[in-house]
Amino acid sequence: MQFEIITTTAQLHDFIATLDGSPISLDTEFVRTRTYAANLGLLQISQNTQITLIDPIAVGDLSSFWQAIDNKNIILHASSEDLEIIRDHKGDLNFTLFDTQIACSFLNMGASLGYAKMVETLEAVIVDKGESRTDWCARPLSEKQINYAGVDVLYLQPCLEKLQQQLENKKMFPFFEQECQSVLAQKMVKQDPDKAYKLLNNLFKLDRQGLAIIKALAKWRLLTAQERNLALNFVVKADHLWLLAYYQPTSLDDLRRLNLLPNEIRIHGQQILTIMTQVISQDESTYPPLVNRLVDFPAYKSTVKSMRDKIQLCAEKYDLPLELLASKRVINEYLSWLWKLTNLQRQTANKPKLLTGWRFELIGHQFEH
């Protein structure tokens, strides 16, 4: 396998000059253990069978490359984390995405088919995944690591060409394109710190004051994590936020009794208590409403069963995996929109995934909208 390794800005500019309008296969290798943002360790690109590895640690500023892929066709596999890295470095996702994992899903090859399995199925090649857990920010990289990284983009374009033909035969290619663009759009939605608490568990067990506390603490935790580039749980563990909101301690000794980690108390203990005191002093009218679980709605089980029966028939009709067509999360998003919002609120709220695009065309139109 022949490839070029780029370690200087001059080499990068020379490489960018060779890029044409052909699809660009792309992959990233990164490390994210204690940090909020992933640390990019290697960038792999393949275009027209030419494989190039960019060393971001050696090169430094990659802005010219990110600008060069504007409006290009980009091939990725299982793109979620790659897109986050590209977004954080590039500032946007202004390109057309072709995610081969999504393509495999539309062909019912598996809802989350791995790269190695896809290559084995489509190219009859066994890919060694032995270096997947390596430290990609350590230098120097071994020959084995470099070869592994190159293979990760080597087969993307040949696989996509076969997948595209099968998708067109199945009349699913436009739906695949829609889904890929939807993934891009979702990745560009900025996380609202005021809504960070909604991603936490067991909110239904909290009263309104507890919800106000966990809302404020979750916002503070997110902003602190972003500012200090720390993984969220290295600021304060999610479970500990809930304990704070439920028991509402008033002293550092109380925090110790709740079994918060020593570092959490030493670094953030006083700040946590200050935030809680501020929330408790606020007018109750500012507190969030109680959280109603979907499973507690009387009609939930019967409605989900009825929906799943229809979705199953549709999945069989179009030979699609159930999880792609309408996963549990997609169903719950729809029911939350239907049951938790008023008619007026539904008119202005974003429509659930089930009622948009190709899902609405295939199945969503059968449900109340």
From Swiss-Prot:
This is Ribonuclease D. Exonuclease involved in the 3' processing of various precursor tRNAs. Initiates hydrolysis at the 3'-terminus of an RNA molecule and releases 5'-mononucleotides. GO terms for molecular function: 3'-5' exonuclease activity; nucleic acid binding; nucleotide binding; ribonuclease D activity. Belongs to the RNase D family. Its cofactor is a divalent metal cation. NCBIfam families: rnd. One of its GO terms (cellular component) is cytoplasm. Residues 4-168 form the 3'-5' exonuclease domain. It comes from Psychromonas ingrahamii (strain DSM 17664 / CCUG 51855 / 37). PANTHER family: RIBONUCLEASE D. One of its GO terms (biological process) is tRNA 3'-end processing. Its main location: cytoplasm. HAMAP family: RNase_D (MF_01899). Its EC number is 3.1.13.5. Gene3D superfamilies: HRDC domain, Ribonuclease H-like superfamily/Ribonuclease H. It catalyses: Exonucleolytic cleavage that removes extra residues from the 3'-terminus of tRNA to produce 5'-mononucleotides. Signal peptide: none annotated. Keywords: Cytoplasm, Exonuclease, Hydrolase, Nuclease, tRNA processing.
